[in-house]
């Protein structure tokens, strides 16, 4: 819950029984956008931190920060990290063992693979295929980074399993197709060492997806005027 700054646990069985009281696993004090638990009793955070992109928080390590948002050159590096991060928002997804995760950016073809240990985050791979065009607006009290409508949307969603990473790719711009730019027909599958495995070309654009633990089935939300749940196996 971003507004309450809480990470809560939702039990589907209890929800079906009408119980909507969710236990709080962690209360975030860092203004994170997303939080994922790790197998080491710590929490990985993604946010517009002052100088960094990720945080790692736990009783035995406190709060530590890692890496910064991408930049194409020295000039873009001078843009404040919190402001630059608004142009490089994306999807964070971890494997079931909670010791590896992927961060894929929506506004540009950039993704990174990471591993988590007891007190550190290590980047194992990064792919950079381009950078977004955007403006920066910072009044001191408000900040934003409006994007160019000509930007080609890249990795709309990411999903991770024990063996593989999956990236949903758009390749379209808002200028060309409007909000359909936030859907994609291509899913790239790669191993955690970044070895390409497969490229799935779907028959119709999808807006979101997940993959079975055995990696043999893809479930997707398809927008055909009405949203449909589809299965690929």
Q: Which residues fall in each region the model found?
A:
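Surface-exposed loop and turn segments in beta-propeller and other repeat-based domains
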Residues: 20-30, 62-87, 122-150, 203-204
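Blade-level signature of beta-propeller repeat domains, shared across WD40, Kelch, NHL, RCC1
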Residues: 210, 216-233
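Short loop/turn segments immediately following beta-strands, especially the blade-tip
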Residues: 10-17, 114-131, 232-233
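Conserved small/polar residues in nucleotide/adenosyl-binding loops
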Residues: 2-3
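Structural signature of eukaryotic scaffold interfaces centered on beta-propeller domains
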Residues: 32-40, 82-105, 150-161, 210-214
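Loop/turn-rich, solvent-exposed surfaces of beta-rich toroidal or solenoidal domains
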Residues: 148-189
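Beta-propeller blade signature
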Residues: 9, 53-59, 180-195, 233
